[in-house]
Amino acid sequence: MLKLLSEIGPVIAFFAGFFYGGGIQSATLYMLITSIICITLCYIIDKKVSKLSIISSTVLFVSGIITLISGDSMYIKIKPTILYVIFGIIFLMSGIRKNPFIKYALESIVRLKEESWIILSYRTAAFFFFMAVVNEVVWRNFSDETWVKFKVFGVIPITFIFILLQLPLLLKNKLPDSKI
């Protein structure tokens, strides 16, 4: 539950900051503060922070601070694109190397045949590259308000749909001792 909260908490803070705090600058500040709180809580409670969270937070802090200093919202808007491309490369390379990163992230929940992990890595890489393109299209062609709404009401459902579309692969190729 804490992991989920640490992922969506900053997004909710960004949304609230944009609509109730006065725009992208406020939203960015709220998201940075919430991210620091969430990472700190994760570390205090779990005694660790995942590598993906460290990557996400680093990109967030760099793009967020540049946005706040420069007053240019472009930097916070390209943050998702940068993250999606980084994650896409990580999952693609781990599939190519036959050492799927996604296996380490999900193995406690589901156990699959090795070739299924590789397929899932490629699909996840494709998903992240797709999301990078979608983010670029939305922020470059629509208003700040539309982009912020997309981050909350578009990205989450698209991600959920992607996960649902992976269920047939997971269910067909799970090992007998799998939890799902």
Curated annotation (Swiss-Prot):
<comment type="similarity">
    <text>Belongs to the YciB family.</text>
</comment>
<feature type="transmembrane region" description="Helical">
    <location>
        <begin position="4"/>
        <end position="24"/>
    </location>
</feature>
<keyword id="KW-0472">Membrane</keyword>
<keyword id="KW-0812">Transmembrane</keyword>
<keyword id="KW-1133">Transmembrane helix</keyword>
<feature type="transmembrane region" description="Helical">
    <location>
        <begin position="150"/>
        <end position="170"/>
    </location>
</feature>
<feature type="transmembrane region" description="Helical">
    <location>
        <begin position="25"/>
        <end position="45"/>
    </location>
</feature>
<feature type="transmembrane region" description="Helical">
    <location>
        <begin position="76"/>
        <end position="96"/>
    </location>
</feature>
<dbReference type="GO" id="GO:0005886">
    <property type="term" value="C:plasma membrane"/>
</dbReference>
<feature type="transmembrane region" description="Helical">
    <location>
        <begin position="118"/>
        <end position="138"/>
    </location>
</feature>
<comment type="function">
    <text>Plays a role in cell envelope biogenesis, maintenance of cell envelope integrity and membrane homeostasis.</text>
</comment>
<dbReference type="Pfam" id="PF04279">
    <property type="entry name" value="IspA"/>
</dbReference>
<dbReference type="InterPro" id="IPR006008">
    <property type="entry name" value="YciB"/>
</dbReference>
<feature type="transmembrane region" description="Helical">
    <location>
        <begin position="49"/>
        <end position="69"/>
    </location>
</feature>
<keyword id="KW-1003">Cell membrane</keyword>
<protein>
    <recommendedName>
        <fullName>Inner membrane-spanning protein YciB</fullName>
    </recommendedName>
</protein>
<keyword id="KW-0997">Cell inner membrane</keyword>
